[in-house]
């Protein structure tokens, strides 16, 4: 697994700036897991499901934390303040994200370019991007004081991810 990850890091060195570190840890690990499982004879679809299940299990503790945070009436305004700052520090090479102006009780972000899609497509696994999109759905779809809305996701065939959080 480590050897595969080292090869992937080398092959995707343009993405390895410090801002992309957290994304690449998840992305390249899942890609390497699929590659290793395939090399051991597991069909790709099963290998991808194995990686997806591991990721979904990993985020389970975050769901409770997110719901607790979103139980506050100020949650959407908090996102408006913190998310643009966070992404300025964590979106590196390969990302194109904008934060359109919106009403007081909404926060929107539009992702035009996503490194998950770019890298998974490069390795012939664009369907893996949808697995990461599902993480957003899992974390944000059932929040107590905010609706998580979108009309499209890059990983599910859209031209962008147009996410909006609207206060309930």
What are the residue ranges of the model-derived segments?
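Short, flexible segments with low predicted structural confidence
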Residues: 4-5, 111-113, 134-135
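Short, contiguous strand/loop micro-motifs
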Residues: 20, 123-125
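Generic intrinsically disordered, low-complexity segments enriched for polar/acidic and small residues
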Residues: 18, 53-55, 113, 137, ...
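C-terminal non-catalytic interaction appendages of large macromolecular assemblies
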Residues: 105-108, 118-119, 126-168
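Compositionally biased, intrinsically disordered low-complexity regions enriched in proline and serine
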Residues: 16, 57, 94-96, 151, ...
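N-terminal, charged low-complexity regulatory/assembly segments
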Residues: 1-37
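Amphipathic interaction/junction segments at domain boundaries or subunit interfaces
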Residues: 25-123
């Amino acid at each position: 697994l480590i050897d595969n990850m080292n090869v992937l890091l080398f092959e995707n060195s343009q993405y390895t700036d410090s801002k992309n570190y957290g994304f690449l840890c998840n992305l390249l690990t899942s890609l390497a897991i699929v590659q290793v499982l395939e090399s051991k004879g597991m069909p790709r679809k099963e290998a991808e499901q194995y990686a997806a299940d591991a990721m979904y299990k990993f985020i389970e503790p975050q769901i409770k934390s997110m719901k607790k945070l979103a139980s506050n009436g100020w949650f959407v305004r908090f996102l408006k303040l913190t998310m643009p700052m966070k992404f300025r520090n964590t979106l590196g090479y390969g990302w194109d994200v904008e934060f359109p102006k919106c009403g007081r009780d909404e926060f929107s972000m539009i992702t035009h370019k996503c490194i998950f899609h770019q890298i998974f497509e490069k390795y012939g696994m664009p369907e893996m991007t949808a697995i990461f999109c599902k993480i957003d759905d899992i974390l944000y779809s059932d929040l107590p004081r905010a609706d998580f809305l979108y009309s499209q996701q890059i990983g599910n065939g859209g031209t962008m991810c147009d996410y909006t959080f609207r206060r309930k």
